[in-house]
């Protein structure tokens, strides 16, 4: 397949008002999607549009709506909702596509567009290529009698809450549990507190007062220290932090210790194995901590690594018949419960596992020993990152680094595809060995640059 012109690994994203993240481009994008969906159809396609809480969402929602309606597609406006909720609603409302206006964990001045298929899954490469091709064609408005219509959906919140509840056993309850929720001033701000309270938890909420500008600003899964401090302050059993669009989740235990995606993957894998729910191979990424790989091996749980990005984790799970995977950042996939990464559903799976195993979050992690890991970004003065990584002296240094940590960790290089940077990562069970190996390997990359 030829290189993508607009789409990245997770839709289209960037700074508002710069490049393609502009109202006129999003208008054309909506029109392109509408034209792709109407091809070969006599019936008007239906497209759902959701968004997070950043202020530019209003502008892009209107632009998408206009472009789609002009192409002859009907639109349902969902309003602020978690990204995975749009995936679910696209499927359950029998829509032909779902669109989310969000830049996930990025600051308010960024925004982006993500797409879902009729099945509530990320678009395949062929459909993305068709949309890109349509973008290079003139804007088209159908005859007046074929124009689409737009309505605002009123029952989306209730539908999604019931979907989340259905992901755990019918008798599941959180009575007696005190938790802190950090909603990142984002798309989960109204849903998550309601859901966890309905399940019986005592909920202390932070990061749930969005103003369009404060999404992810010092709150949420990218600023876990705030959650940890609040857990300690109010004596909660644990804390849960989402990112701005609700597809990531991180936690803090009762002592305020941060719990990342690798930790949560371990809790779920071990519990699911014991209950017979675990199938296939657990999938992580190149960045998944070596300690998790070793801990799963000790439990005889097969594990494999995919490229960084939940798109690639999902692909590996589907190809290998697995249902559990995730990233250190908190993108967790529980494919027997949701078609995409869902922060709320993932949090419920962890809480259900802890309840079934009669363990606190801290106790559930006592058998997992992660190793020190560090990444250094080496910025290049010239030359492509891929060419630097493939240079003979860099490859020799990489082989030496891998030999130094063999059986105790890993060493690898990742050339950036978007900037002149080589990411150098080393992890080892000894911090001194890790740092020494990292210094040597990153030095070799700098010398080659």
From Swiss-Prot:
PROSITE patterns: PGM_PMM. Its EC number is 5.4.2.10. Catalyzes the conversion of glucosamine-6-phosphate to glucosamine-1-phosphate. GO terms for molecular function: magnesium ion binding; phosphoglucosamine mutase activity; phosphomannomutase activity. The modification Phosphoserine is found at residue 104. It holds the Pfam family PGM_PMM_III. Belongs to the phosphohexose mutase family. It catalyses: alpha-D-glucosamine 1-phosphate = D-glucosamine 6-phosphate. Its cofactor is Mg(2+). GO terms for cellular component: cytosol. The lineage of its organism: Bacteria, Pseudomonadati, Pseudomonadota, Gammaproteobacteria, Lysobacterales. Keywords: Isomerase, Magnesium, Metal-binding, Phosphoprotein. Mg(2+) binds at residues 104, 243, 245, 247. Activated by phosphorylation. PANTHER family: PHOSPHOGLUCOMUTASE (ALPHA-D-GLUCOSE-1,6-BISPHOSPHATE-DEPENDENT), PHOSPHOHEXOSE MUTASE. This is Phosphoglucosamine mutase. It is an enzyme of class 5 (isomerase). Gene3D superfamilies: Alpha-D-Glucose-1,6-Bisphosphate, subunit A, domain 3, Alpha-D-phosphohexomutase, C-terminal domain. SUPFAM superfamilies: Phosphoglucomutase, C-terminal domain (SSF55957), Phosphoglucomutase, first 3 domains (SSF53738). One of its GO terms (biological process) is UDP-N-acetylglucosamine biosynthetic process.
């Amino acid at each position: 397949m030829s290189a993508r012109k607009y789409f990245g690994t997770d839709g289209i994203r960037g700074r508002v008002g710069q490049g393609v993240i502009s109202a006129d481009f999003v208008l054309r994008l909506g029109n392109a999607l509408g034209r792709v969906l109407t091809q070969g159809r006599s019936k008007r396609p239906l497209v759902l549009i959701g968004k997070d809480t950043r202020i530019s969402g209003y502008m892009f929602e209107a632009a998408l709506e206009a472009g789609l309606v002009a192409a002859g597609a009907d639109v349902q406006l969902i309003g602020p909702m978690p990204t995975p909720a749009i995936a679910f609603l696209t499927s359950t409302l029998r829509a032909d596509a779902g669109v989310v206006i969000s830049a996930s964990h990025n600051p308010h001045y960024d925004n982006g567009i993500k797409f879902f298929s009729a099945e509530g899954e990320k678009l395949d490469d062929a459909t993305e290529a068709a949309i890109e091709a349509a973008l290079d064609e003139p804007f088209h408005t159908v005859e007046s009698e074929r124009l689409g219509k737009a309505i605002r959906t009123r029952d989306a919140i209730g539908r999604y809450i019931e979907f989340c509840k259905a992901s755990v056993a019918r008798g599941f309850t959180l009575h007696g549990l005190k938790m802190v929720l950090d909603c990142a001033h984002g798309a989960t701000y109204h849903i998550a507190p309601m859901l966890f309270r309905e399940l019986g938890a005592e909920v202390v909420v932070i990061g749930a007062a969005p103003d369009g500008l404060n999404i992810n600003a010092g709150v949420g899964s990218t600023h876990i220290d705030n959650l940890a401090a609040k857990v300690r302050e109010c004596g909660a059993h644990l804390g849960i932090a989402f990112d701005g669009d609700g597809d990531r989740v991180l936690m803090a235990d009762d002592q305020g210790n941060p719990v990342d995606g690798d930790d949560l993957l371990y809790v779920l894998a071990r519990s699911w194995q014991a209950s017979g729910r675990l199938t296939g191979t657990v999938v992580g990424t190149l960045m998944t901590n070596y300690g998790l790989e070793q801990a799963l091996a000790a439990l005889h749980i097969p594990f494999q690594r995919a490229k960084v990005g939940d798109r690639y984790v999902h692909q590996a799970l589907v190809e290998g018949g697995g249902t559990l995977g995730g990233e250190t950042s908190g993108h967790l996939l529980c494919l027997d419960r949701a078609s995409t990464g869902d922060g709320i559903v993932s949090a419920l799976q962890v809480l259900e596992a802890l309840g079934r195993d009669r363990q606190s979050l801290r106790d559930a992690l006592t058998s997992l020993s992660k190793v020190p890991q560090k990444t250094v970004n080496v910025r290049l003065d010239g030359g492509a990152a891929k060419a630097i990584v493939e240079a003979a002296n860099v490859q020799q240094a990489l082989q030496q680094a891998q030999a130094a940590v063999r059986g105790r960790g890993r060493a690898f290089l990742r050339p950036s595809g978007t900037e002149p940077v080589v990411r150098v990562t080393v992890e080892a069970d000894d911090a001194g060995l890790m740092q020494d190996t990292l210094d040597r390997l990153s030095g070799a990359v700098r010398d080659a640059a």
